[in-house]
């Protein structure tokens, strides 16, 4: 709904054949379970061990962004790509392009935007702001937090913004253990280039893999 309301792009729901496949072609779910994005797919054993998840010969590594403290102070829709920009012209890419097209390894970038009851959330923030106001005499940080909450509420009411929750993760894989070490570093470096704090997940990798299955991304 958010994407369609922007007027710039349109999203559509995938058909059943596109999800589960047909007799002649593999569907998105089948390709996801085998980590084979194109061509013929083969059945693969899946090891959901907490310390190391494997699908066939491939080992997975996963990085997440789910805490506001891990995000940069300012998030924009697009950034200047220096390598293709000049003094007279800018090459603009998506803010998340470092973990998308610019990440040169086998990977999947998952992005979840959960639309909650916005009015209910704003009421919770109003209550939190009043609590911060009452506690501001005990700590300057409470006063600062109240100002941030007030600023958020003012913008939400002024521009009719919808309150959402979001989660992002990058799932990468390789059949070579040594290469996987370099991939972990590359993913972390790309997240750091976005001024985000990289968080390498190990224990909950199988859970997040299962949650990212096409059609299984509900809250």
For each predicted feature, which ranges?
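Extended, folded cores of ATP/NTP-driven motor/assembly subunits in large transport
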Residues: 1-219
